[in-house]
Amino acid sequence: MALDVLGRLGFFNCGSGSVVTPCSASARLSSELEPSKQRNRSWFRSPGSGGSTWAVANILCFDKDTIPESFRNGRLRSRARQKTLLEGASRSSLSSAARLWISKTAGIPSSRTGCRGSVLNGGWSGGEVAGEGRKSLLPIKRHSSCSSQSLPQQQRRTKDAGRVVCYSHRKRNLGSLLGSRVVEEPWSWILEGYVLKGLTGRRNDGPSELELGRGSYRGGPVHGANHIRPLQRPDSVHPQPLTSARPRRGTEHDELPLRRTLRNCIPHSRDTPPKRDTGIASEKDWGINLKNEKTSESGVNEDGSTWYRESGEDLGDNGYRCRWTVMGGKNADGTSEWKEAWWEKSDWTGYKELGAEKSGKNAQGDTWWETWQEILRQDDWSNLARIEKSAQKQAKSGSGTAGWYEKWWEKYNAKGWSEKGAHKYGRLNDQGWWEKWGEQYDGRGAVLKWTDKWAETDMGTKWGDKWEERFNVGIGTRQGETWHYSATGERWSRTWGEEHFGNGKVHKYGKSTSGESWDSVVEEGTFYQAEPHYGWADAVGNSGQLLSIVALERPPGIYPDLDLGMNKEQQ
């Protein structure tokens, strides 16, 4: 796990003289690392590296022709009092050593440097020792496998060693460094691969070598975590086979130019199943981008896989309009397939809808399906504006022994009322489980929350737990039950309850089938959340694409049929 986290952040070996060498031949991309594992991690111990300690150093690698304007002229133009701790100071060719200014600090992140987690600790093998905040000049040596023939075509023309920039960050964004653009994960800005090679030092029992994976610069952050793994030799790394119907690349070194030329003509597939317990995705996660004209295109990739994409517009009564895009693809033998659809709907009543649906299967027979929707409409009873979000997801293994289904929904209106909930089901071999939960806020202080979970086996054993709470102005109740049924017919249950009077007194009671019982009044404070942590204002702020949908212009003298709205056929 430590190596996975370090692979996303970049690192230096603190126990020995470390050098950074560009090596475009070493490329790996992984998307399994959770963002929550990247936070507040400053120190790790790398297994198999002689017990040396590794410190996190945020690294950005750019090719000469793709360096953003704010990074040019050998200096990082920082704002908001952020400091440059490591910046490229040379554009020499690969045949000569480039140089970096590296800030070496003491053993913990220091407020004097302003760089949280981007620190170097200890002495280098060459005996160079610098105090806290001082800078020392260290060379970047050329790696033996990084000849001009092993570089992508664009870099062969320039023979440039690229640039490396280490910076401090605040709130995990680059907004102060790249103008108004906010990047939630700045560590993913990596163009070319770099190998971090730990030489033998005073605190190393032997040399260790690790590979920093390479992503592709697409004018934005690279998606997916950059994986670090033990490495024997960079030239011994082989590209991993793709299991999807996504168009494949000829060679690893040609990957960057191909992505730049094919990205606009081949649809980017979502050929992986959805993940469980991830709730309702945001507009940004789906990346819906509809075309204004009717199109129909298809193609065959070099590996024999095929793809297609169609776009169009449907019109109906009452100003109904639906703009849509459908795309898909499959591999050469048809064992792997994916489909995806995007749409936006509107009419003269003010109804707006943004949605997406995807499905697929792989060579192992696994299948999946997912749909997502955002809706803006007028409430039928209160005439208030209302935003609704929903998602449904399901996946099933090819063997039929495992599968799951989830339904999520959120509803908000302009007066603070909101409702959220989910239904979940899963099965693995002979065991199945269910979960339902919901919460409702009336916008005036009343709250209802509930949860119901249960599971069972094919042998007849069942167990579960449920609870409910209702509160308003500090007064309310809580009650619940835990139960178990055995395969032999034995039953056990425990029920409990609480009455909160709003004056600091709470009545607690309960009993069980095994003879337990209690009934008492205690002095205890009452806590409950009267307002949702995510409400109407948040829903509006995160629904920019939905709100920007433009309806058809209504002719003069024509008024919307409010009773008709959107009929079932149109929906």
From Swiss-Prot:
Signal sequence interval, chain numbering: none
Highest taxon in the source lineage: Eukaryota
Listed name of the protein: Protein EARLY STARVATION 1, chloroplastic
Biological-process GO terms, alphabetical: negative gravitropism; regulation of starch metabolic process; starch granule initiation; starch metabolic process
Region (Disordered): 142-162, 215-254
Chief localization: plastid
GO terms for cellular component: chloroplast stroma
Reported function: Binds preferentially to highly ordered alpha-glucans, such as starch and crystalline maltodextrins. Involved in the organization of the starch granule matrix, thus influencing starch turnover by modulating the accessibility of starch polymers to modifying and degrading enzymes. Required for the control of starch degradation in leaves and starch distribution in nonphotosynthetic parts. Promotes gravitropic responses, negative in shoots but positive in roots, by facilitating starch granules (statoliths) formation in hypocotyls and roots columella.
Gene name of this polypeptide: ESV1
Protein family (similarity comment): Belongs to the ESV1 family.
Organism: Marchantia polymorpha (Common liverwort)
Keywords, comma-separated and alphabetical: Chloroplast, Plastid, Transit peptide
Biased composition annotated in UniProt, kind: Low complexity: 145-155
UniProt keyword Transcription regulation present: no
Locations listed in the record: Plastid, Chloroplast stroma
